[in-house]
Amino acid sequence: MGDYVLRCLTGGEVLEDHYTLACPHHPGFVRAEYTAKQLTVRENLPGVFRFSDWLPVRGSVPTRSRPVTFQNRELCRELGQPNLWITFTGYYPERGCYVPTGSFKELEALPTIVRLNEAGGGTLVVASAGNTGRAFAQMSAEFGTPVVLVVPESSADKLWTAGYFDHSSIRLVTVRGDYTDAIKTADKICEAPGFFPEGGGKNIARRDGMGCVMLDGAVTIGKLPEYYFQAVGSGTGGIAAWEAAIRLIGDGRFGSKFPELHLSQNLPFVPMVRAWNAGRDHIIDEDMPDAQASISAVSAHVLTNRTPPYGICGGVYDAMKSCGGQMYTVENKDAASAASLFAEAENGIDIDPAAAVAFASLISAAEEGSIRTNADILLNITGGGYQRVKKDCETAKIGVYETVDTGEVPVL
């Protein structure tokens, strides 16, 4: 399962994988090339590991966390799109979704901890605006993998676990600053021996874990969708969708055309949208005017990465150029309306603010006629069901280990 080689996208050379995040000789992403050219969905394996053929792991851990793809006829009628498919990764038992932290970030955390343990283990250092940190905290509480979570001070209340309450392997460090400041602090922690960065977009386990959304969608629909909608902060989910599509096209059973990527950001913080619409392969300061105030004003704080892998080889720009598509800006009020519409159609389920941004962009595209009626559309609902989790499961907040200023290194 998951046999692969690791290839540098810039230089083309094959690298040894020792939880390798980057090529030592070239900038740009590395990518897993799997021995299995056709995907076998392994129903006997738990959760997301059913897609182990295309995950960079040999084994698995017990889990029910996986994406689930379905249709809602009411939403299809509302949008005038009869072939709208929703891939939901969250907590929604009526739809067979049992992700305890409510976020698709568990699709990244699960293969990452298995990959690290198979490479010899260590302490993972995770910078997060909330959802990623919660996913890795859940994995740490369940499986004992030591983690250091580094989050903005304002995100501390988003860090909790469901059903598992031993937090002895978790150190939560809060930073007086934003998500990018948390990343800088995490990088400094990783300079000490025994501490390993989870890697963000550079981590093939994270990207290929997220790519399982596209895999589940294509397997359920029976082919690749024409359009793929997701909200992005780092843009790694869009990259993951592109890479999964490359593999599905290579499989030969799901079509030969890339899905268009329709990616969205939350106004007023929309640096990638500005760069893409200007035709640039890089982000400039003018794409983030008054960044701190803009970050404070969004409803989806997980979408506020100031240093996304946009122009890097294998990054967001390359994904968009390969697949085609559009980028959207979404106002808070439109995201809130989209969330209400989803809840009305789906048993009151609350979707993540980022997922609401994605859904709002789809509503806008349908209203403006920028997507073809009757086309197969895949909407990535990246999280939801938080109220149900807290109703059905006991949850425990993670205590803060230390609060630091930007760039300050905590004593661990």
From Swiss-Prot:
Pfam families for this protein: PALP (PF00291)
Pathway participation: Cofactor biosynthesis; coenzyme M biosynthesis
EC number from the UniProt entry: 2.5.1.76
Reaction catalysis annotation: O-phospho-L-serine + sulfite + H(+) = L-cysteate + phosphate
Top-rank taxon, per record: Archaea
Swiss-Prot/TrEMBL cofactor(s): pyridoxal 5'-phosphate
Assembly: Homotrimer.
Entry function: Specifically catalyzes the beta-elimination of phosphate from L-phosphoserine and the beta-addition of sulfite to the dehydroalanine intermediate to produce L-cysteate.
Name used for this protein in its record: Cysteate synthase
Source species: Methanocorpusculum labreanum (strain ATCC 43576 / DSM 4855 / Z)
Lineage, broadest ranks: Archaea, Methanobacteriati, Methanobacteriota, Stenosarchaea group, Methanomicrobia
